Swiss-Prot record:
Domain Rho RNA-BD: 48-123
Keyword RNA-binding belongs to the record: yes
Record-linked SUPFAM superfamilies: Nucleic acid-binding proteins, P-loop containing nucleoside triphosphate hydrolases, Rho N-terminal domain-like
Renumbered residue ranges of the record's region RNA-binding 1: 61-66, 78-80, 108-110
Gene from which the chain derives: rho
Protein name: Transcription termination factor Rho
GO biological process annotation, one example: DNA-templated transcription termination
Amino acid sequence: MNLTALKNIPVSELIFLGDNAGLENLARMRKQDIIFSILKQHAKSGEDIFGDGVLEILQDGFGFLRSSDSSYLAGPDDIYVSPSQIRRFNLRTGDTISGKIRPPKEGERYFALLKVNKVNYDKPENARSKILFENLTPLHANSRLRMERGNGSTEDLTARVLDLASPIGRGQRGLIVAPPKAGKTMLLQNIAQSIAYNHPDCVLMVLLIDERPEEVTEMRRLVKGEVVASTFDEPSSRHVQVSEMVIEKAKRLVEHKKDVIILLDSITRLARAYNTVVPASGKVLTGGVDANALHRPKRFFGAARNVEEGGSLTIIATALIDTGSKMDEVIYEEFKGTGNMELPLSRKIAEKRVFPAIDYNRSGTRKEELLTKSDELQKMWILRKIIHPMSEIDAMEFLINKLAMTKTNNEFFDMMKRS
């Protein structure tokens, strides 16, 4: 019996399974409690149980394997990991662990890890010799992440504009600057779908902080990847815990030479959460931001890097502007120069219902010559010269109309050459 397999089953089927196993009153329980009861029943019959999760080490030295299905929220189906196992395998918060588990004994509340089979999808012996993330050498992004799918659909137009306006590479630290209702969520969904389609080798994680519950459900259904969320009805401490778990998991995977991509919506709300949680230093910036509050969200965003030893961590985050809040403006100003790719969205374009509402002239990537071939780069620069005199609305309408005539950007450049 596998714990992860049970978590993927809908609640109605779990209740049916529980009824067959002779369990009662399951309909009134939370999903995690139902899973706990079913596993306990199977364990009594002597069946082997396996489970996995992401390790969170607490201050007392022991830890728990949390599940991404419940967005790393503590629950009855968490798996206890003893301090001796943590020391033996040199485990750290964020390690993805799978292994054999046992049911709780008399007086215990949680399932416990008996045997570690894999650490970060690798043998436990290999995990011990990994170089710490902080000791890895950061480089400029030099391997392109293409967004274009080449199927000629209207959704692909967004990806193609993105490829032209600001190319994304493995290890990019990108900021999508978005006013309200400019289509940032749609843009993130497009990026997520393009990555899943073109780069299935990358580990994709979508982190939604302070979002609406219905948007979380929509994102989970659309994105082939891990969607971790903390909705607006959760406390700030929960937003912080979720983001820490996601970034620690990403760092551990990069240590194992994996390419990880985090799409964060939004870094402004994350910074607000840290501002609430961090102890008051007495120094307050404009808009009510504590002087120490932005250190940890900057550390989150600054973790994005291309690594010389292999692997990369890409973070594409949205920053909110024009919300009427002075605090949001201060947070944006603090993050403004930290990224190496910027993609401003325009409210004017979105109000005319032209999507994607990208401000083409103001968007761009640093060191884009490392990501694009020289001939393609020349064509992109010529396109910028053509578009530069136009207003932001005219530029976007012109570009979308021309791109709609072709299926791929190469065809578009050929058409440009002929005309």
